[in-house]
Regions:
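Catalytic, metal-anchored helix/loop core of enzyme active sites in primary metabolism
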Residues: 1-169
């Protein structure tokens, strides 16, 4: 939202939304069937409610975000993807057709994206901890293991045109 709000999407080649992978990211798929709800609720980076914690642990929250981005910015679903970034500092990566790449990064505090949505012109200063730039050293960005997180495969069935399919998700 922050990077695209006043821009045309014509120059966009690809947008990656990042997910931490939640508390189950480093767990083997074999151990998934024995996961307890209490484990899935213990997000390593964010303090969240129960539903969003479970959605994060399964990557369903990212499925919702991809669908939202597609509709809000009128993007082709094929130009959107999800990457795993366990530290949760980078929230989106926008790749442009001209070769430039823009990263949206901030501290793991939901006040920041909410604040910037409410005060979208950027003239107000938020009172919270800023991201220490050195935390961006050695960024870890990985493709989603779709066998481990099969819910992301729903995105393969999203029609190019707006339909009620997305509402049913």
């Amino acid at each position: 939202w922050y990077s695209l709000k006043n821009k045309s999407n014509l120059g966009i080649k690809k947008i990656y939304l990042t997910a931490s992978g939640g508390p189950l990211n480093r767990l083997s798929k074999k151990k998934f069937k024995n996961v307890k709800i209490s484990q899935a609720l213990k997000h390593p980076n964010w303090k969240m409610g129960k539903k969003i914690s479970i959605d994060s642990a399964t990557l369903m929250n990212k499925v919702f975000e991809v669908v939202e981005a597609k509709n809000i910015f009128n993007l082709d679903i094929n130009n959107l993807d999800i990457l795993i970034h366990p530290k949760s500092y980078v929230h989106a990566i926008i790749c442009y057709k001209n070769g430039m790449i823009e990263l949206i990064a901030h501290e793991t505090n939901m006040k920041i994206p909410i604040f910037n949505t409410l005060y979208e012109n950027g003239d107000k200063q938020i009172k919270c901890k800023n991201l220490d730039i050195s935390k961006l050293n050695n960024l870890s960005l990985e493709k989603v293991n779709k066998k481990k997180f099969p819910l992301v495969n729903i995105l393969n069935h999203i029609p190019k045109n707006n339909t009620l399919f997305e509402t049913l998700i």
